[in-house]
Amino acid sequence: MNREERLKRQERIRNFSIIAHIDHGKSTLADRILEKTGALSERELREQTLDMMELERERGITIKLNAVQLTYKAKNGEEYIFHLIDTPGHVDFTYEVSRSLAACEGAILVVDAAQGIEAQTLANVYLAIDNNLEILPVINKIDLPSAEPERVRQEIEDVIGLDASEAVLASAKVGIGVEDILKQIVEKIPAPSGDPDAPLKALIFDSLYDPYRGVVAYVRIVDGTVKPGQRIKMMSTGKEFEVTEVGVFTPKPKVVDELMVGDVGYLTASIKNVQDTRVGDTITDAERPAAEPLPGYRKLNPMVFCGMYPIDTARYNDLREALEKLQLNDAALHFEPETSQALGFGFRCGFLGLLHMEIIQERIEREFHIDLITTAPSVVYKVYLTDGTEVDVDNPTNMPDPQKIDRIEEPYVKATIMVPNDYVGPVMELCQGKRGTFVDMQYLDEKRVMLIYDIPLSEIVYDFFDALKSNTKGYASFDYELIGYRPSNLVKMDILLNGEKIDALSFIVHRDSAYERGKVIVEKLKDLIPRQQFEVPVQAAIGNKIIARSTIKALRKNVLAKCYGGDVSRKRKLLEKQKEGKKRMKQIGSVEVPQEAFMAVLKIDDQKK
């Protein structure tokens, strides 16, 4: 192809993604677009075609982003090339969203005609605005009896400030309005700007590991072209590779001769090491490299940490391999080895949030068949010592000695909660119970309110989301962003079993709620830990001070069964002998802690409600 043909082709490319709150119909709309452009035959279409992972289909959510190339014949006879990049809607996966938006020029904003704007809609729209994308509002599900398209249109204008007069009214389920959406994509979304003759610049926005071809990098070409046989260089590491194959997804991978400006596709270059293709890195030509890399993504810091240990310690290396493979296409996962006296060898893993943690855990158990024990999630605390040094603590067992601590700061988040009027009371109560401070409250319309609170992240990590949903019968939606660290009065609580600290059960808690929490945990553990032959005290302690205790009663055999009648001193002798034996057992006996006990420490709040 000569330069002219390339530029002509470039003008007909449209790169866009679909953004929406969970359940507003994003994946269904993607299905309709695939169907309308003839990317898949009727036979191949299944619901949520782009959600390839079994877990995604089961939970009905999108976790990974996915890219597809489609061809669309417009009314004017021109053939356009669409690249649709599907994005997740859940708050834990905003990073995935920001990655897919960086590879686009436009975004379709899907809003449910019955529910209106939700918290995550807002979060994702702001990401799109930051990336200077052209946003096309679509009001979906207009076939529902409860749909109020006009109210939602007004809401889009008032809350986001987008002009919604030309918003498409659609129903992805029945296929209404899909043609209009395709028409708007052609008319409103700009073609990619890039120079086909400049040195190659390609953004890696995802990657996955293929046992036969090595690492497969998903790329968006910004400048130049890439074809097999070309030497490429990673700009962050400076490593060089030779391209072996390039292709596009139509949803299935299809090999092509070259990828040009604006294309979204994949390339393989016999890259064996997972670490060499960092998501967000720029690929350039090794012979004539680009002057500077593309502005990458911001470095992602995990917010929530927990320990993961294989139940069978011999599978420690399998777990490491599993985590490495997952990390390859999940840039936000972070892990390092750690050991625990109670659980043996394992890893300390960092996640973006609780859903992220749950999904990684489930993927390890499903895809790699490793049974896991996970410890209570914790956040990163900044601990300032009396000698002026500062330590980051993401594991309660690493907390320095209380005498050496000057102050502890914990991460706070700004929580945006959208909630129907009737539930404002319970939600405010919940936020205050979680040590939240009230910031702002706005009425979106006569039925819905937006509440903004500053809440410690550690309070959200446990079960804030579940509590919020149950307090509002599932109507509230919620989104949060980190706003920095603030000093708090925190203490580390240890749990002692039979006088021994169980390191995996330690956690950090606010001093005011320490006593309550200690009491609840001790009671709960008493029910969960199986009874032993001797009695076991369960204690909660702050430093050396025991603040709560309960006792697991011993199992005992009836030693008097064989004495029919007989003298009382004979019975006493047998009882004394049993007591002696139990005492000896207690000195050498150890207690097994079941997995439920670790999870119980998290879910204590159930008791309080």
Swiss-Prot record:
<dbReference type="GO" id="GO:0003746">
    <property type="term" value="F:translation elongation factor activity"/>
</dbReference>
<protein>
    <recommendedName>
        <fullName>Elongation factor 4</fullName>
        <ecNumber>3.6.5.n1</ecNumber>
    </recommendedName>
</protein>
<dbReference type="Pfam" id="PF00679">
    <property type="entry name" value="EFG_C"/>
</dbReference>
<dbReference type="InterPro" id="IPR000640">
    <property type="entry name" value="EFG_V-like"/>
</dbReference>
<dbReference type="Pfam" id="PF06421">
    <property type="entry name" value="LepA_C"/>
</dbReference>
<keyword id="KW-0547">Nucleotide-binding</keyword>
<dbReference type="InterPro" id="IPR038363">
    <property type="entry name" value="LepA_C_sf"/>
</dbReference>
<feature type="domain" description="tr-type G">
    <location>
        <begin position="11"/>
        <end position="193"/>
    </location>
</feature>
<dbReference type="InterPro" id="IPR035654">
    <property type="entry name" value="LepA_IV"/>
</dbReference>
<feature type="binding site">
    <location>
        <begin position="23"/>
        <end position="28"/>
    </location>
    <ligand>
        <name>GTP</name>
    </ligand>
</feature>
<dbReference type="Pfam" id="PF00009">
    <property type="entry name" value="GTP_EFTU"/>
</dbReference>
<dbReference type="InterPro" id="IPR004161">
    <property type="entry name" value="EFTu-like_2"/>
</dbReference>
<dbReference type="InterPro" id="IPR000795">
    <property type="entry name" value="T_Tr_GTP-bd_dom"/>
</dbReference>
<dbReference type="InterPro" id="IPR027417">
    <property type="entry name" value="P-loop_NTPase"/>
</dbReference>
<comment type="function">
    <text>Required for accurate and efficient protein synthesis under certain stress conditions. May act as a fidelity factor of the translation reaction, by catalyzing a one-codon backward translocation of tRNAs on improperly translocated ribosomes. Back-translocation proceeds from a post-translocation (POST) complex to a pre-translocation (PRE) complex, thus giving elongation factor G a second chance to translocate the tRNAs correctly. Binds to ribosomes in a GTP-dependent manner.</text>
</comment>
<dbReference type="GO" id="GO:0005886">
    <property type="term" value="C:plasma membrane"/>
</dbReference>
<dbReference type="Pfam" id="PF03144">
    <property type="entry name" value="GTP_EFTU_D2"/>
</dbReference>
<feature type="binding site">
    <location>
        <begin position="140"/>
        <end position="143"/>
    </location>
    <ligand>
        <name>GTP</name>
    </ligand>
</feature>
<dbReference type="InterPro" id="IPR005225">
    <property type="entry name" value="Small_GTP-bd"/>
</dbReference>
<keyword id="KW-0378">Hydrolase</keyword>
<keyword id="KW-0648">Protein biosynthesis</keyword>
<dbReference type="InterPro" id="IPR035647">
    <property type="entry name" value="EFG_III/V"/>
</dbReference>
<dbReference type="GO" id="GO:0043022">
    <property type="term" value="F:ribosome binding"/>
</dbReference>
<dbReference type="GO" id="GO:0003924">
    <property type="term" value="F:GTPase activity"/>
</dbReference>
<keyword id="KW-0342">GTP-binding</keyword>
<keyword id="KW-1003">Cell membrane</keyword>
<dbReference type="GO" id="GO:0045727">
    <property type="term" value="P:positive regulation of translation"/>
</dbReference>
<keyword id="KW-0472">Membrane</keyword>
<dbReference type="InterPro" id="IPR006297">
    <property type="entry name" value="EF-4"/>
</dbReference>
<dbReference type="InterPro" id="IPR013842">
    <property type="entry name" value="LepA_CTD"/>
</dbReference>
<comment type="similarity">
    <text>Belongs to the TRAFAC class translation factor GTPase superfamily. Classic translation factor GTPase family. LepA subfamily.</text>
</comment>
<dbReference type="GO" id="GO:0005525">
    <property type="term" value="F:GTP binding"/>
</dbReference>
<dbReference type="InterPro" id="IPR009000">
    <property type="entry name" value="Transl_B-barrel_sf"/>
</dbReference>
